[in-house]
Amino acid sequence: ERNKIQDFQFEVLKRKSDMLPLLESYRKNKNLTFRIPMPEVLDYCVLEYSFALWQWGTSVSTIPSKSADDQALFDHLMEISGPDYFAENQPNISFFVQAARELGYYGYDVKPFKKYLTIDSAHGYLNRIMLPGELVDKVDFRPALYHKIYNFLKDNDPKMIFIYGEIDPWSAAMVPAFKGKKNEQIYIQPRGSHRARIGNMPEDMKERILTQMNKWLAE
């Protein structure tokens, strides 16, 4: 699966000169503005692709073959990892600010693609291209909230159920399974994505979750 994903990323980058006119047309149609040049936008779309595909549980069977035409490759990239994510004035900009200040954010490994990328490094991309213009280079990460939450869960035993998807990259930051906790419960949906919910968990997990919730509610 990983090889097929990376092969697609390589193929898009190798065809960058053909992809850029399609991306520019897409930008105009959606009236998007960016803080960086379009070749760099394409780089970030490709780098985000693997995270986005796993995040939403998209089957690798939907990935076009390396011999597919430019439009097929481009359409698939836009479906999974469109440039809207990196555009200015997006609806989730407040989340990006909180990520930069309190939550932290994931990075991109550019090493495998270095030969084909326009950018030299993706370090600090969140602050550079996704925050409001007036906050660029002015928001420093402060881990206090992270430590506060971690210490609260470590030192207490609140009645909490945590649900994750097995293949969701965000699950890499799941809550630790602290020893000696009676109430903390962690459920990981097999092959689940960011769409993991109580309602779509395997029946045995769903039954245990609902039984526990009803027990707590009856206390």
What are these regions (language model features)?
Residues E1-T33, H147-D155:
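The feature captures the conserved acid-bearing segment of alpha/beta-hydrolase catalytic domains
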Residues K16-F141:
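Alpha/beta-hydrolase fold active-site neighborhood
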Residues G82-Y85, A144-I149, S171-A173:
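Short alpha-helical segments and helix-capping/turn motifs at coil-helix boundaries
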Residues P91-N92, L153-N156, F178-K181:
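Extracellular/periplasmic catalytic domains that process cell-envelope and extracellular macromolecules
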Residues V110-K111, P169-M174:
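Conserved alpha/beta-hydrolase "acid-adjacent" motif
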Residues N156, F162-Y164:
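Short beta-strand/loop motif that positions the catalytic acidic residue
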Residues G165-I167, V175-N200:
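Low-complexity, glycine/alanine/valine/leucine- and proline-rich hydrophobic stretches
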Residues Q189-E219:
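Catalytic active-site module of serine/aspartate enzymes centered on a nucleophile-bearing elbow/loop
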